[in-house]
Amino acid sequence: MCEKSQTIKELLNAIRTLVVKNNKAKVSMIEKELLAFVSELDKKFKQQLNNFNELQQKIPLLQKANEEFALKFERMQREAQNQIQAKLDELNLKNKKELEQAKKYAIAKTLDQPLNIIDQFEIALSYAQKDPQVKNYTTGFTMVLDAFSRWLEANGVTKIKIEPGMEFDEKIMSALELVDSNLAKNKVVRVSKSGYKLYDKVIRFASVFVSKGNKKS
């Protein structure tokens, strides 16, 4: 810009030399106009230069802000992906457990008939102790009953062990009737029908008679 100003000034001097003798006032007016124009150009140039310098100073800050934003976005994206994957894993695990549970307890729907057969054999064995004619079949009944019991156990089915004198437990027992007994109140007097569990789930409550606890010996 300084070189341009110098060139214009030289031009002004040349013009002044050529026409100074004829029209000094006109030369002075032109000179003022040119000088004002040069001054305005110089101001604009300096302003643009200042703007450029300010922009250059801001570039590192903008670059840093851009890098920080990129890192933040990458971190947010990674966290979102991890959360989505964790949710998918949770759903898959839940579905897997539900499927395993369904398979585990699917046999429960088919157990009514085998359990009823076992009930009949247990009744027959109890009568065998009283009836000599039936007692001859005890060995055969016992073998069949044992075979059924082993098959049930192999499939996760176990008989709930209940003995007379035990406390009545509504979680595994169903009370058929309250009866007079020498046993304390709420004690099991007799088991009418055995209860069973499939793994840890009760699939049939034991039917029992429960003591009123009011009979004196």
From Swiss-Prot:
Please indicate if the UniProt record lists Protein transport as a keyword. no
Superkingdom to which the source organism belongs: Bacteria
UniProt keyword annotation of Disulfide bond present: no
Output one GO BP term.
protein folding
Endpoints of the signal sequence:
none
One GO cellular component assignment for this chain's record is: cytoplasm
Q: What does this protein do?
A: Participates actively in the response to hyperosmotic and heat shock by preventing the aggregation of stress-denatured proteins, in association with DnaK and GrpE. It is the nucleotide exchange factor for DnaK and may function as a thermosensor. Unfolded proteins bind initially to DnaJ; upon interaction with the DnaJ-bound protein, DnaK hydrolyzes its bound ATP, resulting in the formation of a stable complex. GrpE releases ADP from DnaK; ATP binding to DnaK triggers the release of the substrate protein, thus completing the reaction cycle.
User: Under what name is this protein listed?
Assistant: Protein GrpE
Per the UniProt record, the lineage of the source organism begins with: Bacteria, Bacillati, Mycoplasmatota, Mycoplasmoidales, Mycoplasmoidaceae
What is this protein's gene name?
A: grpE
